[in-house]
């Protein structure tokens, strides 16, 4: 898209105008965007047209190569970081003479599968629709586009939008002959939607090149009320399936009831010993390692918009757990969720039978200072205290006869990782929040942590590098579902936010 070498000469030779105010950056970048809306959307649509499921290796590489070319066209030193068995990471490097800080921006270019049957248009045929649902011809876009229009395609919001917003912000700065105030790094992953199985190894293999003062995670939607959001942490996660056993085959409940142990009854009592109805985890020692929220985190949580009453109405809930605690306060605590229970049958399939086994699937959300290994140890000790003999595979007949109560525990090792949280008073993290608010021109939401889990701890690393999240997509974007979309105004806002982050001067 335009001005490829001019900026390199003017901005980095020291001839550019330095130190623009946040207002100047926002207004100038906005004017640039208004002049180039068709080109921006067309370039975005080109990227969205390439299928991008993480396991589709040929198309994943096509995505990576297009992104790499896109950044090289902006005079960003770009290469593909690769290790065996992993999709390439697109890594961009832009050093600024005199800059003392390095900031790395993360996004991912892979997307969820598109098996959902109710896509209005094909997921890899990007379609721009006006608010009334009518399509806009991408081949003949008007000079100015309705900001409430939406671009429909897989990964329009999750998570290719930050990539096109970043390159457009670079274009706008180049056109204005302004240079960034920090050294910039760009890290675009190709397997986030399948759990980032190679991320740890890749970060280790390229540790020297990836040294940075701050990571900015550009993924996810803004707050539900439309406010811009900056988050400072995520919860960790681990999960397991527990299977308990009764007779070695189903038994007639009339002939054997009150005599043969019922595994469904055993399982429900075991689960009841682990969690109460107010979300309190009853496993001894579970809270011993939990780091309590800091006063600054509690203050930030209290200042977040409280939409609990509306959410309750929307969800048809007359009560919530741990009343009167707010949703945001509860998200800073560990949690035990029972994902599902299987055993016997119900409805028309029900029979008067004592089942031979019953299984529960459980996930834990962890907070700082907790580790998956520590939680596993506590859970297994608790199960044993309840009288169970723990096995790792279905018991044979000898094991059944030797132990009156048996539990098979199967942990999810690949999907387990600790929590991560950057202090909300960290100067670099505060700088990000301040810039986002300046660019937004309105009060933003600062969240000490999100309720979900991503491997943010890998970016923190042993150096405890600050990590903050700056989600940019509209909250109603249908990510992971049919008709995923990005509201154009969210894209326009993202361009301004990135320009502000590139040019804002972090305090020491």
Which residues make up each language-model segment?
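Bacterial N-terminal signal peptides
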Residues: 4-15
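A short core secondary-structure module
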Residues: 257-278
């Amino acid at each position: 898209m335009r001005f490829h070498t001019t900026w390199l000469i003017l901005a980095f030779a020291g001839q550019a105008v330095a130190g623009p105010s946040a207002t100047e950056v926002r207004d100038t970048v906005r004017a640039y965007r208004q002049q180039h809306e068709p080109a921006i959307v067309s370039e975005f649509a080109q990227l969205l047209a390439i299928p991008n499921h993480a396991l589709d290796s040929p198309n994943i590489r096509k995505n990576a190569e297009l992104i790499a070319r896109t950044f090289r066209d902006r005079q960003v030193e770009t290469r593909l970081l690769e290790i065996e068995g992993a999709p390439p990471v697109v890594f961009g490097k832009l050093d600024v003479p005199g800059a003392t800080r390095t900031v790395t921006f993360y996004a991912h270019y892979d997307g969820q599968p598109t098996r959902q049957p109710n896509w209005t248009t094909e997921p890899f045929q990007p379609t721009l629709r006006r608010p009334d649902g009518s399509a806009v011809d991408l081949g003949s876009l008007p000079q100015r586009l309705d900001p409430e229009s939406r671009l429909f395609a897989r990964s329009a919001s999750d998570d290719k939008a930050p990539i096109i917003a970043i390159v457009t912000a670079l274009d706008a700065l180049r056109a204005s002959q302004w240079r960034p105030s920090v050294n910039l790094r760009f890290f675009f992953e190709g397997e986030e939607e399948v759990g980032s199985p190679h991320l740890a190894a890749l970060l280790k293999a390229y540790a020297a090149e990836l040294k940075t003062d701050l990571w900015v995670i550009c993924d996810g939607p803004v707050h539900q009320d439309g406010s811009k959001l900056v988050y400072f942490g995520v919860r960790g996660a681990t999960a397991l399936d527990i299977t308990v056993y009764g007779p070695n085959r189903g038994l007639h409940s009339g002939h054997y009831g009150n005599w043969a142990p019922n595994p469904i009854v055993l399982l429900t009592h075991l689960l009841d010993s682990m969690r109460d109805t107010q979300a309190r985890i009853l496993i001894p020692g579970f809270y011993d390692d939990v780091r309590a929220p800091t006063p600054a985190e509690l203050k930030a949580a209290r200042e977040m918009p409280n939409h609990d009453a509306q959410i309750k109405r929307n969800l048809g809930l007359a009560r919530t757990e741990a009343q009167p605690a707010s949703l945001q306060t509860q998200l800073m605590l560990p949690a035990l969720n029972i994902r599902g229970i299987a055993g016997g049958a119900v409805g028309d399939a029900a029979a008067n039978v004592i089942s031979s086994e019953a299984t529960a699937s459980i996930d834990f959300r962890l907070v700082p200072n907790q580790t998956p290994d520590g939680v596993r140890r506590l859970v297994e000790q608790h199960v044993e205290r309840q009288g169970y003999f723990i096995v790792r595979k279905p018991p044979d007949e000898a094991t059944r006869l030797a132990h009156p109560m048996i539990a098979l525990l199967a942990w999810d090792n690949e999907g387990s990782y600790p929590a991560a949280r950057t202090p909300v008073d960290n100067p670099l993290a505060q700088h990000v929040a301040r810039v986002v608010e300046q660019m937004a021109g309105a009060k933003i939401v600062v969240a000490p942590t999100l309720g979900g889990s991503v491997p943010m701890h890998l970016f923190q690393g042993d150096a405890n590098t600050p990590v903050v999240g700056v989600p940019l997509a509209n909250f109603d974007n249908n990510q992971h579902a049919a008709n995923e979309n990005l509201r154009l105004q969210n894209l326009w806002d993202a361009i301004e936010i990135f320009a502000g982050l590139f040019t804002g001067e972090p305090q020491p």
